[in-house]
Amino acid sequence: PAIIVLIHDGERALLGRQAAWPAGRYSTIAGFVEPGESLEDAVVREVHEETGVVVDAVEYHSSQPWPFPSSLMLGFLAHAATTDIRLTDAELEEARWVTREQLAAGEIGVPFEHSISFRLIEEWYDADARRPLREEPNVNRWGSGRT
């Protein structure tokens, strides 16, 4: 299985971008669970390996079948115990903290609506009873440009 996690410090969410993705497109942090590792430990390890951030309060959110490589993606939310980003892994070209306002303004490209990554971002975005992310008119959608 693989884990995918939305890391937040309350006011900001940590999103990453791979070099192969178009500029401005970001997603949540993900990685594979190692043999003998709990899902929660995989979240802590992957986040630290890829971003240098330490997380706590790891909470299961939902899952989604993942066609590559025929796996199951298990989604989590986690609180950032530290916020300094150090890209320690070649998987990400960039990682950055983003605000709800940046998402609403369309400054950050997000994944497709049906992806687990989008659902995790939306869960955090809507945590304080704001309008759901999918209804924001200027949000830049992953792969579809500005709406």
Question: What do these predicted ranges mean?
Answer:
Residues 64-89:
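Active-site-adjacent beta-strand/loop module that shapes the phosphate/pyrophosphate-binding cleft
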Residues 1-28, 32, 54-57, 78-80:
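N-terminal strand-loop-strand
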Residues 10, 81-83, 100-103:
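Generic structural motif
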Residues 22-26, 88-147:
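Nudix hydrolase/Nudix homology domain
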Residues 28-62, 76, 84:
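The catalytic Nudix box helix
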Residues 13, 21, 66-68, 103:
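Surface-exposed, flexible loop/turn segments at secondary-structure boundaries
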